[in-house]
Amino acid sequence: MALVAIEKVGQIGIAKETSPWELPSNVWSDGNNVKTDEGSIRKSPGFSEVMATCPIAPYHITQITLGSPEFWVVAGLAKIYCYDNTGTTTTLDGSITSVDTTITVDSTVGFEDVGTITIGSEDIVYTGKTATTFTGATVTESHSDGATVTRSTVWYDITRASGGDYSSTANDTWTSTILGGVLVMTNFYDKPQYWALTNGTVLSSQKMQDLNDWPALTALNGAITGTGVPSPDEIVVDSTLDFPTAGTFTVGTEDISYKGKTSTKFTGIGRGENGTTAATHLDDAAAFITTYCRSMRGFRSFLVALNIKQAGVNFPRVVKWSTEAATQTTPASWNETTSTVDAGEYELADTKGDIMDGMQLRDAFMIYKEDAAYSMTYVGTPFIFAFRQLSPTVGAIATNCIAEFDGGHAIFGKGNFYVNDGQRLKPILPQRLRDYVFTSIDGAQIDKCFVAADYGRTEILFCFTADGAASVEPNKAVVWNYITNTFTMKDIPNVAHMGYGNVGDPVLPSTWASASTSWATITGPWTMSYALQDKVLLFADPVSTKLYRDRSGNKKDTALMTSYVERTGLALNAQGQPDFTGVKRISAIYPKMSVNGSNSMTVYLGTSMSTEGGYDWKDAVLFNPDTQSKVSVRGTGKFYAVKFESSTDMDWELDGYALEIDNAGNRGSREY
């Protein structure tokens, strides 16, 4: 009888659906809710609700930080909210009573110019501030010198003030980008939105706005009276600069056609086009061509719009770019017909697929269609940008399916995951894992696939809705560690999108006094300051209307998490050599692992007499590495299997294991 060791069990990860007897002994044939970590395999961290209570069903989340405060921006289908993540407090400098309208504090840094503060149990509205005072305050109670003052409201509705609610859908949801510190978002059904800066920072009192000078926008220079064709047959506006020579524009809810234009007039007018109703319109009313785009991304000091819909007509292969924007502002023009600005457009017409998305990669901008990939590089006037096809066959499966990392772009493509290093696109999924992923995806929910990067863990998450899932939102992620090139899998909670940034861990105690656990049981970092600054993924779950912080605790929010790794097809004999004909007798498993607290793992042994037969799994055995060194089992077969599983609130790490094996001769292999 010999002890055969299997080490570095996290070196490769999971190769699901591969013929397991062909795998190296330290590769897992199945598993879920696990991750690789420096050659070991360990349980995936849990996730916990944060920023409660989210006022909308969240479909997109991103963080913007420009000094203080720090905001998470959450977009739903109809509205956009921001969450103040700063946690700002100050202290009263002198007592106040109900007659006071000015409140003196140590500092107002991090507080809004207009807002609400809380002292004790009282919420106090104020209308202004200086460096050390809140002014225009309405106080109803008395408060003592030295009392703590905090920002009261953390969720703010920043939906645009004019234009009404948004019209996004769950299939064509939002994208976001930052250009010169300005947040820009779009959704393919509304004009792109931007969050204007005030003195170089963002304020929750500032609403989102329709993107300035987005093609094409002007204002009436004089009212339109009546509902017929005006006399003379023209409509005067401030400028027709960004409008085509003929077409249709919108005023209010009316579509108006024109056959020609001068610098300030549209001529050859047609009223109430496209089934709209002709109406009167006031002087200075907005006149615009309704233009949407599937995605908008920042590149250098340009905005790049991808897959254009204009006046109801889709141009799915068109790329538009703005003129260059000054710092902390949006571009002044998108007019590609004039040589006085750098705006332009180009159609990627050599393949028939739609443009899905794009993203900067070093000094180039990569554009991904359904069926191809392109590089867009700055060349200056007169062309501004040059376009080069990188692949005529590989693209992105949906919008938000690209993540940047040190090695380039990670792309969720059709039929594989790819890495674009700027020169070529390389597939990265092992064959059998690829087969598993693309036979597991719910084909009706492909548009909901997305990719997220967890830079702190050097991981890329490829997220999708598994066939047969209870929800249409993604519930499964393949996790690729791009440093170790390992793959694992995990469950995610009906997530429409993930953002990356700072948010506190609600599971960790905030002070020594509040800690009720021991060093052995706590799973977070020791230093709370790092826990607050460490960036993590935030999950946007529109089904439960919640936001979750990844890497928080060991559970799926409040539910227990089942985590396991399994290896079938092992055929090592007592000499540690693969032997597909000899029968082996397994009498013990020696896990080399650690757990938090006094928790126990569940260990299984399975045996089989052939590659075609199923496994006879023996009874589960509990194993606590603090008090035990081995798991006593009994099984005989030509092939055998092991499984390590947990389903309680615990953390564990498995470095390797050894098997006590005795060669038991040869027998027939066919099972009947």
What is the role of each PLM region?
Residues 1-86, 156-160, 165-181, 353, ...:
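Beta-sheet repeat architectures centered on beta-propellers
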Residues 45-60, 157-169, 203-216, 290-449:
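Beta-propeller and closely related beta-pinwheel folds
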Residues 71-86, 123-125, 131-136, 190-207, ...:
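Short, surface-exposed terminal/edge motifs of secreted or surface/virion proteins that either
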Residues 75-77, 187, 253, 307, ...:
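Structural signature of WD-repeat beta-propellers
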Residues 80-85, 153, 192-198, 311-339, ...:
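Short beta-strand segments and strand-loop junctions that repeat across beta-rich extracellular domains
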Residues 85-94, 199-216, 501-517:
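Internal, charge-rich low-complexity segments
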Residues 85-152, 207-286:
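Autoprocessing Asn-cyclization modules and mimics
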Residues 173-215, 296:
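Hydrophobic or amphipathic alpha-helical targeting/insertion segments
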